[in-house]
Amino acid sequence: MRWSLCCHINVRIAYTICGIIIGLFWACVYIFAWKNWVALAACLTATAFAFETFYFYLSVKRDTILNWKSQTFQVLFWINLIVGFLSIGGMITAIVLAATKHQGVSNKDQHGLNWWSTATWFLVMLKWTWQNAFIARYYGKLLTKSIIHPEEPDDPSTWKF
């Protein structure tokens, strides 16, 4: 049995859909209940990268991901890696701002601008972007390998018993 990145592709798709739903739910909370626009922006950006992950997994399930161009994987890898590093910087900045402004995490403290929520969504963004970078790198290498060394036809004389 071959080891996979996590588990069956349907489980990965379901996990990603849950992440998208949670992101959209919290976006509604930030809009209608807490009016935290900075956390909303970070939340929606992280959710957009979750949609990218969903598209990756859907392409894997449909077996169309290796039809993509090699440059597509390189561009996606670098964009996701750079945004991941930026989200680390955003998370550290948000934590420092939350600590220096003595913000809390209670329901009452969440109304208006709260940097703890923003830091959390920068962490979520880091998860999705680096996961996407890993997937893009993996399938980019797989595509390059399949172009350079196409699969040989199965020759019974080479079988080992």
From Swiss-Prot:
Keyword Membrane: yes
Pfam families on file: HRG
Transmembrane parts of this sequence: 13-33, 38-58, 75-95, 115-135
Membrane topology according to the record: Multi-pass membrane protein
Keyword Membrane set for record: yes
Localisation: Membrane
Triggers of expression: Constitutively expressed. Not regulated by heme level.
Gene Ontology terms, MF aspect: heme binding; heme transmembrane transporter activity
GO cellular component, one term: lysosomal membrane
Biological process annotations from GO: heme transport
InterPro entries: HRG (IPR026218)
PANTHER family referenced in this protein's UniProt entry, alphabetically: HEME TRANSPORTER HRG-6 (PTHR31525:SF2), HEME TRANSPORTER HRG1 (PTHR31525)
Function summary: Heme transporter.
Entry's family note: Belongs to the HRG family.
Name of the molecule in the record: Heme transporter hrg-6
Gene (UniProt): hrg-6
